[in-house]
Amino acid sequence: VETGKLGIDARWEIDIFGRQKAKSRAASNSLQASQADLYSTWVSLSAETALQYMSLRTLQEQLRITEDDVKRQQEALELIKINNQSGIINELPVQQATYALSQTQAEIPSLKKNIASTMAALSILTGTVPGEIDGLLMENTSLPTVNPHIFIGIPAEALRQRPDIQAAERRIAAQQQKTKAAKADLKPRFSLNGSIGLESFSSGGLISAIGKMIGIGPSITMPIFNAGAIRKNIKVQTEKEQEYLALYEETVLKAVGEVRNAVTDASQDHIKSEELKSAVESAQQAESLAQTNFDSGLSDYLSVLDARRNVLSARRQYIMSRGQEFADTVRLFKSLGGGWEAMDMDQEAEADSHAKK
């Protein structure tokens, strides 16, 4: 007589002390910490793209005002040559104006080279073929404006949307659940064991009977021989939890410092831009007066050139300051985790961060 069996065995652990639930929550929080790390990378990439974009607009604006100044100097040089040929003035102003024009024209190739390299960097950051977005970047070369009111009244709660803080919170929550699961290992485990299948009996090569086989019963497992190892693991998990708490505090303090510095830089550079704007206006008035004095024979042409250089220098400083102001704003938003809109996180995970051990 021969017997044969075919069936399925199953075991279901009754999670009385929350061991399996704690493990599941720990895995969920660890996943969300990884998602926050990924979001942090996205914020850094977006900020770098914005900074490169603003650098491009600053260079383009510098090129525009330099080319504009070249045209003005060329017109002035033509007028000076006419006056020289008429005997009104001598050769000195002609040479001075020619020298100044050549100096200004020499700056254009460097600006164009920097513009090309910045466009290439933007192509890399946006994942496009070099040259593909150049036409788009040349359509509107004006500098973006910055609203100074965004530096006022930043809510403290905005810090919690920083991905590094969110990741630190999720890791604390995950470690709390791991500690909870480790403590549950000291408790007995209750489970139900079940099996279902078919059993056959045969004699002489002929199947004589086929019957159903069903079995179910409870079981209990006690940590008798490995209790010492479990207690060691509990100690390890508890120490890790303290490490994550210390890391969280360090992350928060770092975030507060970064936001404070970003706000200070942005607000002070805005004040600097306003002062430089006034400086440009004063330099333009001084240039007009110098030109009038030269036309009246009250001063030489060198004073006109000095005044014109001051205008160009003031305009460049103003453009660079506006670019720096925008860069400060980008860094401010980066320090806030990409803005004031909180990252979309699972609502249940928020409750998990306050779960008890």
Question: In which residue ranges do the predicted regions lie?
Answer:
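Transmembrane beta-barrel architecture of outer-membrane proteins
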Residues: 3-5, 51, 96, 153, ...
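Amphipathic alpha-helical coiled-coil segments
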Residues: 41, 45-68, 72-82, 98-100, ...
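Bacterial Sec-pathway N-terminal export signals of envelope proteins
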Residues: 143-173, 223-224, 249-252, 263, ...
